[in-house]
């Protein structure tokens, strides 16, 4: 590891560049899935009761970067308009600072959404390509009286959520002197998936849209308006007991049909039904559920489980608003299960072929997921993170007691996350909702909390946190 303190270092803040100390100089050409998400950075913030050692963190980060040279590289544009990462060990930004206040008692009743940016070393997405801008930043904030907060920003064009957490898990294991699996970076495994449809039809674009002139700009404009206060994240927690009751109810609905649904299917269906009621759309209106999925398990044998990059796709099961409101939990959960089952090796191969063709035709900058384009209208997007190891990121002082991220500006976006170890088996749910629906929830909070937690049994339902 090499560390270069910046000239701005002072008593309360230290900014350094952490490097592996070795560089291959290799150029990693990013895949079509990497390019689809673009060079935006994804934030993660972890709260620890005990104080972390900044010097030791910088040392272990330098060591683990030897296995993750992409993160200490820089992004560059290729002559054909594609993107690559030059593995030149230009380094990772590491900021260490001290807060004047004590550690807040964060949790589902007191999230860290408000002011969470103070724990992050931000990166502007339009200041990444062909610039000396790090693809990963760390900010370590020590709280008055003890405890530390670790905030990360990782460029989404190099890693999806699974890869992100595998890196953090590898770093934490390196920090504790434990082995960690080697990542697989070769993007050719994604290119090798490409299989044009047998009849020549462009079926690979079923969940993608090549936008017309102005449509993408209009979407970005709506997104900027939403980020200026038009969307609020509402948080609530479902206990393990509640989830078990939910799955039992869904299973009972499907008795005799030979259909199976998981606990996550049941929770997803329940959220879709409640949010569908909250949306209050006309009976004949189309309701879509965008199911974001890691496709590694569906293409095993071609894309290794250790693949480190973007391997995410989505499907969009749908029904009318009336059907969503009237169908049983089990029927809707079965539709969710069928939606995930669409992620076959053949479908992923056709999608890769479609994206490759759009890149070769020079139309790739206009390609967007239909799920994102429809987020202001017909689609609720759901990202299930419940199996990611948020509460396993232990840097020698124990697991974090809370994990959080800034509010999502895209309306009708739902994230499902695991709960901390003391609430093992539960789920924390974050819902980005438009202002009008948030107002409805606030005006009748007790009633709506009851709807969300109808499977909780007796007692007060878990509150909604705004």
Model-derived regions, located:
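A short, structured beta-strand-centered segment in the mid-to-C-terminal lobe
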Residues: 226-235, 302-339
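Non-catalytic N-terminal regions of enzymes
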Residues: 1-208, 229-292, 296-306, 367-466
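Alpha-helical membrane-targeting segments
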Residues: 197-229, 350-357, 361-368
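Non-membrane alpha-helical secondary structure
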Residues: 212-215, 238, 328, 347
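Short, compositionally biased low-complexity segments
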Residues: 32-39, 211-223, 304-313
């Amino acid at each position: 590891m090499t560390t270069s303190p910046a000239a701005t270092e002072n008593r309360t803040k230290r900014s350094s560049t952490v490097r592996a100390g070795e560089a291959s100089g290799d150029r990693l050409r990013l895949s079509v899935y990497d390019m689809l998400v673009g060079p935006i950075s994804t934030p993660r913030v972890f709260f620890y009761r005990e104080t972390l050692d900044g010097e030791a963190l910088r040392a272990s980060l330098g060591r683990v970067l030897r296995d993750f040279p992409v993160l200490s590289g820089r992004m560059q544009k290729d002559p054909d308009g594609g993107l690559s990462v030059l593995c030149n060990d230009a380094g990772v930004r590491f900021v260490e600072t001290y807060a004047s206040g004590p550690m807040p008692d964060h949790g589902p009743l007191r999230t860290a959404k408000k002011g969470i940016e103070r724990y992050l070393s931000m990166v502007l997405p339009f200041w990444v390509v062909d610039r000396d801008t790090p693809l990963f930043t760390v900010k370590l904030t020590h709280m008055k009286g003890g405890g530390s907060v670790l905030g990360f920003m990782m460029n989404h064009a190099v890693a999806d959520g699974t890869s992100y957490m595998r890196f953090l898990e590898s770093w934490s294991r390196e920090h504790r002197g434990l082995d960690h699996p080697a990542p697989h970076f070769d993007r050719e495994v994604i290119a090798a998936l490409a299989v044009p449809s047998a009849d020549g039809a462009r079926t690979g674009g079923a969940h993608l849209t090549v936008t017309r002139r102005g449509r993408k700009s209009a979407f970005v404009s709506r997104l900027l308006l939403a980020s200026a206060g038009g969307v609020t994240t509402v948080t609530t927690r479902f206990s393990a007991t509640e989830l078990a009751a939910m799955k039992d109810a869904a299973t009972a609905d499907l008795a005799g049909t030979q259909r199976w649904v998981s606990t996550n299917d049941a929770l997803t269906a329940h959220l879709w039904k409640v949010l569908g009621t909250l949306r209050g759309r006309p009976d004949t209106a189309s309701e879509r559920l965008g199911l974001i999925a890691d496709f590694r398990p569906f293409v095993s044998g071609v894309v290794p489980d250790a693949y480190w990059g973007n391997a995410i796709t989505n499907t969009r099961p749908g029904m009318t608003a009336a059907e969503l409101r009237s169908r049983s939990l089990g029927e809707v959960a079965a539709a969710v299960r069928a939606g995930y089952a669409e992620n076959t090796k053949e479908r992923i191969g056709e999608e890769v072929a479609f994206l490759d063709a759009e890149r070769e035709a020079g139309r790739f900058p206009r390609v967007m997921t239909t799920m994102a384009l429809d987020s202001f209208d017909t689609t609720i997007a759901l990202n299930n993170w419940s199996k990611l190891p948020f509460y396993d990121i232990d840097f020698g002082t124990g697991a974090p007691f809370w994990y959080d991220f800034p509010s999502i500006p895209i309306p009708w976006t739902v994230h499902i996350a695991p709960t901390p170890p003391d609430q093992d088996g539960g789920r924390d749910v974050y819902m980005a909702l438009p202002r009008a629906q948030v107002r409805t929830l606030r005006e009748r909070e007790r009633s709506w909390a009851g709807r969300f937690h109808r499977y909780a049994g007796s007692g007060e339902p878990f509150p909604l946190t705004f």
